[in-house]
Amino acid sequence: MGAKDLAEKNLLQYKDVFSDIVNVNLFGGRCYVSAKELSREPGELITKAVSDDKLRQLQMDVPMKCKKDNINFFLCLENQSDKNNIMPVRDMGYQHAKYMEQIKEAKESNRKTGNYPTPMTKELNDSQKLSPVITLVLNYSQKEWEKPRCLNDMLEFPEDIGEELTKWIPEHPICIINLASQSETTICQYQSDFKYIVRYLCCRNDRKKLDEYFQITEFELDHPEAFLDWLSAVTNDRRYRKAKELIEETEGKG
């Protein structure tokens, strides 16, 4: 994993940053998810392929569980520095693995309590529901992620029956967040350190705007080391690394 990927993951693992991204992009800036309602989930899932019965490891960037009023839902933030042409299928893999994990836990609970469904072919009781799994793909690139945005964008259909087949295939759209093109209204909704990253991305290709951004912005950072790690990795500018080392040295003396 590259330095940029690690820096992106490192910042997003902070719950205040994670919840901020979710609130802005899922709930229109409404503070629905709080940091205290989040708990970190494993970034690796072990799955067994039906085709050959072999175990496989599935990697997710930053997954967390949100618990509200005894109801859970799962959120995963996927970082992409450029378009990935298989992302709809990758996301299907994430979702399948997470839902199957819940099914396995529910069936194990039924086994322990003897509360089996009738008939057994149901596998779960009618009252047993799964927690939603939502993936947000964060596009850090300056280019808009246009396609693929759903499974159908990846498929090639026979011309004579394409329309008929399309109706029977779930589209499985993915949630792409093009950070560099977010509106001023959206950017103003960010409350965490992530707002500085989005503003940086919005003016990265305009040297004049970028210089002005650094000159007039008063950075009030909750996670300065993580932010500077990200900036250093993205710009390949050692000065940000030096600034981080100075912060760490100052904190050590304090």
Model-derived regions, located:
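Elongated, amphipathic alpha-helical interaction scaffolds
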Residues: 1-254
